[in-house]
Amino acid sequence: MSIYLDEKNPGKHKPFQDASQDIVDYVRYLEVIAGKSPNTAFNYYCDLRNFSKFMKRRRGLVPEDAEMKDIDPKGLDTAFWGSVTREDIYEYLYFLNQSCGNKKSSTARRLASLHGFYDYMVNHASRLENDPTAAVSPPKLDKVLPKYLTAEQAGDLLETSLTQGDFPERDYC
């Protein structure tokens, strides 16, 4: 098995060299067993790397003023992932919202990455006993109203269908 997400185009995504082994194993599980697309697996990988960086700073493993982009996400073992608490998860969500300016949908997706990772660690790999994300709900997403055509725009669309195409009657219907 390749260490690249995209075997046909290995330059598209870098090999998994900058994350803990647990994260690498999880992303491979996503691709091979769960059948997720390479892009989905890669996005989860990036989300978990960012969480690793956040946790290193939160636990004092790097200087408090270290830039997130400069923190090495490697070096966190299974025992470390087992020490993460629900409060750590809440603090991460707050960080994403306040410091990173993530929208609710982005925060929800990053939380889904963590949910999936801990589900894998507890239920599939049997490496951990507790899931700190189990009782954490995603942020409530704003409802987006559908965009609709005005009566005039709908009429224009129908008129256009009568003058274009090989089957104007069908297109009009």
Residue ranges and their predicted role:
Residues 1-173:
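Conserved catalytic core of the tyrosine transesterase superfamily
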